[in-house]
Amino acid sequence: GNLSQAAAAQHAYRQAQDARQRMGMLVQSLSDSQVTDIVSVGIGGSDLGPRLVVDALDAIDSRFRVHFISNVDGAAAQRVLSALDPQRTAAIVISKTFTTQETLANAEAAKAWLQAALPGDGMTNHFIGVTAAPEKAEAFGCGRTFAFRDWVGGRYSLWSAVSLSCAVALGPDVFEAMLAGAREMDAHFVSTPLERNAPVLMALAQVFNVDGLHRPARTVAPYAHTLR
């Protein structure tokens, strides 16, 4: 019923707030450490959203460099890892189910690379999981895990713990400002009359182009190279 849905929503909200707080603590911990490089391992929505944000805001001064690994052929992981120092690197493995084969293959490579230089508990702050199945991430060897709900779709996952690499790269102030912008857009969609509602108008324009004008193709032309 509605009560159970409301309770579930409250639980999800508290979980998200807890994740944000823990993300902030990790960012501070990494900032106080010798880590300078972040390796983000994921595919699809677990890779594209964070990659977009880091690329788009690359002008922001940050002590951290973020490297993305999504290709499963092995060469990409080898190329990234061979140029880094494991003592100064933290790997973030992002997978909703923690069963995605492409992601786990690259995660295994990153884990073996880190373990060779950081035996025992040395990997706690260097091998981090972001997932809707935290028990699987822990079993895989992640020293820290950040959870999100399994109903969070890939195209929306940027607004969850999936954006951990963004929080590290951008710093807490810029990251919180980005989330505030998302909240403003949510509020606009919920409260603005339809005739002035930007997402609704964009959707209606697309429907008209396809069904009315029979033009199914759509061009997205970024005004800045970093938004490509």
Say what each PLM segment does.
Residues 1-32, 36:
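Extended, charge-enriched "interface" segments that sit outside catalytic cores
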Residues 49, 77, 93-96, 100-114, ...:
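Extended, hydrophobic alpha-helical segments in both membrane/secreted and soluble proteins
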Residues 25-36, 80-89, 205-214:
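Glycine-rich phosphate/diphosphate-binding loops that line cofactor/substrate pockets in enzymes
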Residues 34-87, 221-228:
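Anionic-ligand anchoring segments at beta-strand to alpha-helix junctions in alpha/beta enzyme folds, i.e.
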Residues 39-50, 96-104, 134-136, 153-154, ...:
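Gly/Ser/Thr-rich loops at beta-strand to alpha-helix junctions
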Residues 49-54, 78-81, 102-106, 137-142, ...:
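Short acidic, glycine/serine/threonine-rich loops at helix termini
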Residues 116-228:
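Active-site phosphate/pyrophosphate-binding segments
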